[in-house]
């Protein structure tokens, strides 16, 4: 998305407890995965997540919230709680993000023309 001009990544999610193991809390892993997108692409991430409990006939699922905003290097600059609806505000500098992408080799030296084989199941271009 960044290669196509995106300046922010928005991730609306509905992630929470695992019905098979209600003691398992994946919220830290979920945040690290989203933060990895921010750091590797030098782009701010805004990740929203549901809160509360949803009850079905034979199942109940808990959504752990913890929505957050990162800056362009993956630092969390705002984070929500687990149990209440909130509006998060974070100050993001898009020009700093663009400058870093042009300077730091992780993004600058990408060669997307070589990725074509990854787009097909058989690896052909």
Residue ranges and their predicted role:
Residues 84-102:
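A short, polar/charged loop-to-alpha-helix boundary motif
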């Amino acid at each position: 998305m960044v290669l196509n001009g995106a300046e922010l990544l928005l991730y609306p999610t509905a992630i929470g407890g695992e019905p098979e193991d209600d003691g398992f809390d994946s919220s830290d892993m979920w945040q690290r995965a989203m933060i990895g997108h921010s750091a590797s692409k030098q782009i701010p991430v805004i990740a929203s997540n549901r809160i509360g409990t949803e009850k079905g006939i034979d199942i109940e699922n808990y959504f752990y919230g913890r929505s957050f905003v990162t800056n362009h290097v993956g630092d969390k600059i705002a984070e929500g709680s687990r149990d209440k609806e909130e509006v998060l505000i974070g100050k993001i500098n898009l020009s700093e993000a663009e400058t870093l992408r042009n300077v730091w080799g992780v993004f600058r030296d990408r060669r997307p023309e070589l990725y074509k084989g990854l787009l097909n199941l058989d690896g052909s271009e």
